[in-house]
Amino acid sequence: MKIAVVGDLDMTMGFRLAGLEDVYEVKNAEDALNTIRELDNRADIGLIITTERLGEEIRDSISNLKKFIVEIPDKNGAIVREHDPVKTLVRKAVGVELK
């Protein structure tokens, strides 16, 4: 399974330099949503990485997709939230609460 990256220029450039091939630069949330939907239908993609800010804008539209989508901070830093979505995923998958 491959990892795909969907994000802004700074994010995608970093992942390209790291050697990832399935890297897609998008200009806005609509482009990101369309790209992620296309990637969701590809059998060779197992994980999609995007930015927290894009994820926030398209969350309702991507919540029922098949692929595992990970949101990471962009160049502006992490979004402050009441709950950490990674902790929630770990708790659901493993049954252990991270502190």
Swiss-Prot record:
Coiled coil: none annotated. Keywords: ATP synthesis, Cell membrane, Hydrogen ion transport, Ion transport, Membrane, Transport. Has multiple subunits with at least A(3), B(3), C, D, E, F, H, I and proteolipid K(x). This is A-type ATP synthase subunit F. Pfam families: ATP-synt_F (PF01990). It is found in: Cell membrane. One of its GO terms (molecular function) is proton-transporting ATPase activity, rotational mechanism. HAMAP family: ATP_synth_F_arch (MF_00312). InterPro entries: ATPase_V1-cplx_f_g_su (IPR008218), ATPase_V1-cplx_fsu_bac/arc (IPR022944), ATPase_V1_fsu_sf (IPR036906). Component of the A-type ATP synthase that produces ATP from ADP in the presence of a proton gradient across the membrane. It is a peripheral membrane protein. Belongs to the V-ATPase F subunit family. It comes from Methanococcus aeolicus (strain ATCC BAA-1280 / DSM 17508 / OCM 812 / Nankai-3). GO terms for cellular component: plasma membrane. GO terms for biological process: proton motive force-driven plasma membrane ATP synthesis. Transmembrane segments: none annotated. Its main location: membrane.
